[in-house]
């Protein structure tokens, strides 16, 4: 089992405690660790080489969602949180050999978009949030 290459603090399950979201850049999986005992919860055990993650309220429901990219999987994805730490995967692209992702309101419309930097795909891609 490979260790995490990226970690980010966030209240994942809405209990007021800061948990840790983590990715395995040299292995498979995206997970979160629940405070205060740091119990591991697997979010996705199929995505490969997830070098970065970001979190924010992508779907506008008030909880923490996350985005990541799987370099070897060629995936750009975001995970919808139900507010209790259970996640549903949404695939944005199946052709992104990327290392970095960022959640930001790129167009200023009040909805969080996802930005992906593709190293081998040699691109920067903006995935606009479809909420209006």
Q: Model-flagged regions — what are they?
A:
Residues 28-41, 75-88, 123-132:
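Beta-propeller blade repeat segments, especially FG-GAP/WD-type strand-to-loop junctions
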């Amino acid at each position: 089992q490979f260790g995490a290459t990226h970690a980010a603090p966030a209240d994942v399950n809405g209990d007021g405690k800061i948990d840790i979201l983590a990715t395995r850049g040299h292995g498979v999986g995206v997970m979160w660790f629940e405070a205060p005992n740091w119990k591991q919860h697997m979010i996705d055990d199929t995505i490969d080489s997830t070098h970065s993650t970001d979190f924010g309220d992508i779907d506008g429901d008030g909880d923490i969602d996350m985005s990541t990219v799987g370099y070897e999987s060629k995936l750009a994805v975001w995970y919808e949180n139900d507010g209790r730490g259970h996640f549903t995967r949404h695939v944005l692209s199946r052709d992104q050999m990327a290392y970095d992702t960022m959640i930001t309101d790129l167009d200023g419309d009040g909805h969080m978009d996802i930005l992906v930097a593709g190293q081998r795909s040699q691109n920067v891609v903006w995935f606009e949030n479809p909420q209006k």
